[in-house]
């Protein structure tokens, strides 16, 4: 699945040997999340093994965003969600457990949680607001 300018470098990295690819471009691919939080939950991954979102090239970031838009259209027609969360964890303190950057596109549905206000702020539930 490599393309010019892209490389799947690390044989020990699960995200460097993808399965169930939904769509791809020269620099990134999208696939279902293995630990789906809701119907249609997808991750978008650069093909180059890079740990940090901020270490991705401008071209890789653009390729990832292009696929986010593409899979959003597909999720919308297939699952009809009421909203979305987009997330990326950078560093262990932020919850990154796989050191190959990937963005989550998580479809949200009315009633999937009792009170969705705050969105991803729920990650830091109980922390005082500044």
PLM region spans:
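HIT superfamily nucleotide-processing domains
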Residues: 1-130
């Amino acid at each position: 699945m490599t393309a010019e300018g892209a490389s799947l470098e690390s044989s020990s990295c699960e995200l460097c040997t993808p399965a169930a690819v939904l769509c791809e471009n020269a620099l990134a691919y999208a696939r279902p999340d293995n630990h789906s939080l809701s119907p249609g939950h997808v991750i978008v991954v650069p093909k180059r093994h890079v740990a940090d979102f901020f270490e991705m090239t401008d071209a890789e970031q653009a390729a990832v965003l292009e696929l986010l838009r593409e899979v959003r259209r597909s999720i919308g027609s297939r699952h009809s969600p009421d909203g979305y969360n987009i997330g990326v964890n950078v560093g262990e303190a932020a919850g990154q457990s796989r050191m190959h950057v990937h963005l989550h596109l998580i479809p949200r549905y009315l009633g999937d949680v009792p009170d969705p206000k705050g969105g991803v702020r729920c990650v830091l539930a109980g922390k005082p607001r500044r």
